[in-house]
Amino acid sequence: MARKTLRARRFFSLIFPFFFITSVYAEQTPVSAKTVTVEAKNETFAPQHPDQYQSWKATSEQSAREDALAEDPRLVILWAGYPFSRDYNKPRGHAYAVTDVRETLRTGAPKTAEDGPLPMACWSCKSPDVARLIQQEGEDGYFHGKWARGGPEIVNDLGCADCHNTASDDFAQGKPALTLSRPYAERAMEAIGKPFEKAGRFDQQSMVCGQCHVEYYFDGKNKAVKFPWDEGMKVENMEQYYDAIAFSDWTNSLSRTPMLKAQHPEYETWSAGIHGKNNVTCIDCHMPKVQNAEGKLYTDHKIGNPFDNFAQTCANCHTQDKASLQKVVAERKQAIHDLKIKVEDQLVHAHFEAKAAWDAGATDAEMKPILNDIRHAQWRWDLAIASHGIHMHAPEEGLRMLGSAMDKAADARTKLARLLATKGITHEIPLPDISTKEKAQKAIGLNMQQINAEKQDFLKTVVPQWEDQARKNGLLSQ
């Protein structure tokens, strides 16, 4: 009966001088190669959809920053040589999408549009301006160049046109008009047999979220976004795909392992869990129907924890009370956390032991099978923990992946012990003090004082120029 109620409710749902920096970014002008129908300014739709807009704005209340590296300094070692070792915060409200990608140390401190460590693709899940630029420039045009090139263009936070065809008649009539605004996401869904236009309403609801809440990588010279789903969506399928094309995100600076970095694979892990298998969608749990002051139902766009709207989410299907369900979820979360830490401890040792083997004169041939085990172990660990809600979405799959990661890490360490013995090293390889984020970063040679100073200079000088240029071009409200 509760399931019928849910379906009925679904039916109604939806450090150069300042003047130099100024001149560099002032030279950028909008391209008008194609007719653009994507309106990226979210406030444009406030009069037509006031309840949805105000609830979307309320994601700004989810403002707390949680430093994942400070909470777990092991991560610094696992990501040694990669920007995530500098800075990794847990996710917060959608209203901070653009702010957070500007402020993270991972994007560096570029001085010009052609400067910096990361490609344009790093904007891809942050703003409806991405959909506008893809429509305007084409995918090749959008992906071309460095991340800093998009600074004056990608300025509106993740919002309406990311998920809705706001230029359609259906949207004008108050219908949801869901859309995949990223062509690469549409191709990925087709690769797993889910063409968006042929999908049902419930499938489309989750597919829209799956444009961003997925694993992806940067493909080819242009660093275009691609989902590694050609062989399937399970961790082993994606691992097989990456291995076949000899892809790596970076090389760990300690062990010299060609590594894979998982992003935020909620769509994949949700699909593997009981909710996904029963088509209980992202919307059902994170964007329920609620009533406004006049008693009218609307979709709550303050995307958040389902327990915050228990009566409108979990209680539609579950007969247990809130406290009982919270206890179950907490137990699952703790089980995954405990195994996660055990795997990390093994991987930390493996990276330092591999470094010791290289230092002792190990050859590429001797190290290859060991590095392969480290790569596969950390990939499986990462895909499990990068999906922050896996304890709810697919706890069994999370534990399975972590168990497999533990086995692979143990294999690597066994092989390392044997190899080190042939080099005359039979003692335990000592670890440096990595008890805090700062100590771990020092252990891998990061100059965090310099990195932070460069970032602050970028935020004080470059970002204001981006915003001024965006206002001049009509991309931001005054």
From Swiss-Prot:
Amino-acid positions noted as binding Ca(2+) in the UniProt annotation, renumbered to this chain: E215, Y216, K261, Q263
Annotated heme c 4 binding sites: C282, C285, H286, H393
UniProt GO MF annotations: calcium ion binding; heme binding; iron ion binding; nitrite reductase (cytochrome, ammonia-forming) activity
InterPro entries reported in the protein's UniProt record: Cyt_c552 (IPR003321), Cyt_c_NO2Rdtase_formate-dep (IPR017570), Multihaem_cyt_sf (IPR036280)
EC number: 1.7.2.2
SUPFAM superfamilies, per database record: Multiheme cytochromes (SSF48695)
Cellular component, GO annotation: outer membrane-bounded periplasmic space
Reaction catalysis annotation: 6 Fe(III)-[cytochrome c] + NH4(+) + 2 H2O = 6 Fe(II)-[cytochrome c] + nitrite + 8 H(+)
Binding site for substrate: Y216, H264
PROSITE patterns tied to this protein: MULTIHEME_CYTC (PS51008)
Primary localisation category: periplasm
Amino acids binding heme c 5: H275, C314, C317, H318
Alphabetical list of Pfam families matching this protein: Cytochrom_C552 (PF02335)
Subcellular location: Periplasm
Pathway the protein takes part in: Nitrogen metabolism; nitrate reduction (assimilation)
The keyword Heme is assigned to this record: yes
Amino-acid positions noted as binding heme c 2 in the UniProt annotation, renumbered to this chain: C160, C163, H164, H301
Cofactor: Ca(2+); heme c
Free-text cofactor note: Binds 1 Ca(2+) ion per monomer. Binds 5 heme c groups covalently per monomer.
Any one GO biological process: anaerobic electron transport chain
Residues engaged in binding heme c 3: H94, C209, C212, H213
Family in the record: Belongs to the cytochrome c-552 family.
Protein name as it appears in the record: Cytochrome c-552
Organism name: Salmonella paratyphi C (strain RKS4594)
